[in-house]
């Protein structure tokens, strides 16, 4: 019983510490946005992948990095409208 409580408290701690881990009220849009932003940040952080994208798009590395940062603003498009209850 004590171990179960410990696991839940660890999960709650991770969810409060890191944005992308989600929580019980995370919507599908928020989850996908976090996944896309995490992927884009990984692409920017790995030098070889950034070089590959630059060669494939025939752009400079700085331009590719700028485009990736621009895509991080709204990676899945505008958020869906909230339904009012």
Swiss-Prot record:
The answer on whether this UniProt entry bears the keyword Nucleus reads: yes
GO CC aspect terms: precatalytic spliceosome; SAGA complex; U2 snRNP
- Does this entry carry the keyword Nucleus? yes
The alphabetized UniProt keywords are: mRNA processing, mRNA splicing, Nucleus, Spliceosome
One Pfam family hit: SF3b10
Mention one GO biological process in which this protein takes part, according to its record: regulation of gene expression
Subcellular location per UniProt equals: Nucleus
**Inactivation phenotype:** Lethal at the first instar larval stage. RNAi-mediated knockdown in germ cells results in male sterility.
Source species, domain of life: Eukaryota
State the family it belongs to: Belongs to the SF3B5 family.
Report the function annotation for this chain: Involved in pre-mRNA splicing as component of spliceosome. As part of the spliceosome complex, plays a role in the regulation of spermatogonial differentiation. When associated with the SAGA transcription regulatory histone acetylation (HAT) complex, might be involved in the transcriptional activation of a subset of SAGA-regulated genes.
Q: How does it assemble?
A: Component of the SF3B complex. SF3B complex associates with the splicing factor SF3A complex and a 12S RNA unit to form the U2 small nuclear ribonucleoproteins complex (U2 snRNP). Identified in the SAGA transcription regulatory histone acetylation (HAT) complex; the interaction is RNA-independent.
Protein's name according to its UniProt entry? Splicing factor 3B subunit 5
Q: Which organism is it from?
A: Drosophila melanogaster
């Amino acid at each position: 019983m004590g171990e179960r409580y410990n696991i839940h408290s660890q999960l709650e701690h991770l969810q409060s510490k890191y944005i992308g881990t989600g929580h019980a009220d995370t919507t599908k849009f928020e989850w996908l946005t976090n996944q896309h932003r995490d992927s884009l940040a990984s692409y920017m952080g790995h030098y070889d992948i950034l070089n590959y994208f630059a060669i494939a798009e025939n752009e400079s590395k700085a331009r590719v990095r700028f485009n990736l940062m621009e895509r991080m603003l709204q990676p899945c498009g505008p958020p869906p409208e909230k339904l009012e209850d």
